[in-house]
From Swiss-Prot:
PANTHER family: MICROSOMAL SIGNAL PEPTIDASE 25 KDA SUBUNIT, SIGNAL PEPTIDASE COMPLEX SUBUNIT 2. The chain crosses the membrane at residues 50-72, 82-104. GO terms for cellular component: endomembrane system; signal peptidase complex. The keyword Transmembrane applies. Component of the signal peptidase complex (SPC) which catalyzes the cleavage of N-terminal signal sequences from nascent proteins as they are translocated into the lumen of the endoplasmic reticulum. Enhances the enzymatic activity of SPC and facilitates the interactions between different components of the translocation site. InterPro entries: Spc2/SPCS2. Residues 1-49, 105-199 are cytoplasmic. This is Signal peptidase complex subunit 2. GO terms for biological process: protein targeting to ER; signal peptide processing. Residues 73-81 are lumenal. It is found in: Endoplasmic reticulum membrane. Belongs to the SPCS2 family.
């Protein structure tokens, strides 16, 4: 019974994607990386600052649109003209800020986690990129010291076929191996840096 339950549980955890859909493949691999990075490391606490900022900007834009609609309903045009003009400008300004935030701050980041210890705090980020009509999945794992701002990163650029089988099943163990390799490389650099500073 135990083996059957284990097999059924493994079957339920399998993620299958259309391997010809680049966007679906990227999101599935991102989810697998995030699960491995955060699920196996209790010392990493997930942070939602980037997501919350995006949600706040979207909420403000929607609020401006609702306010404009409500004002125009209670104060028909042309009385509502100044408010509508302000709302349109504010709406597109917020969308512009949201675009800049996504392009220059997020940069494909899908996981952010904070690691606290006695000496300092470190911020881990996982980001990815997969260009259209390209099978290469670029995964970047970075760590930044929140005190001195020093940032280090490790990258992996492999075909998505290295992590997905012929049936479109995401091979979590192979994803985990790659994530662990990048994480351990950064952790080793961190230990070397701390030992050098102590000497």
């Amino acid at each position: 019974m135990g083996k059957k339950d284990e097999k059924s549980q493994q079957g339920e955890e399998l993620v299958k994607v259309n391997k010809w859909d680049g966007s679906a493949v990227k999101h599935a691999l991102d989810d697998a990386v995030k699960t491995c990075l955060l699920g196996d490391r209790p010392q990493l606490k997930e942070q939602f600052g980037l997501v919350n900022t995006r949600l706040a900007l979207c909420a403000l834009a929607v609020s401006v649109a609702i306010m404009a609609h409500a004002w125009d309903f209670t104060h028909p045009f042309p009385e509502s003209r100044p408010v509508l003009l302000f709302s349109v400008l504010a709406y597109f300004a917020l969308l512009g800020i949201l675009t800049l935030h996504s392009s220059f701050r997020e940069k494909g980041t899908f996981a952010v986690a904070l690691q606290k210890d006695k000496e300092r705090e470190r911020l881990w980020e996982a980001s990815s990129d997969m260009r259209k009509y390209d099978d290469k999945y670029l995964l970047t794992l970075s760590v930044r010291d929140t005190k001195n701002g020093k940032r280090r990163e490790q990258s992996s650029n492999k075909s998505c076929a290295a992590f997905i089988d012929q049936n479109g099943i995401v091979l979590d163990n192979l994803v985990a191996n790659e994530v662990n390799r990048l994480f351990n490389a950064l952790a080793a650099d961190k230990k070397n840096a701390s030992s050098l500073s102590s000497n």
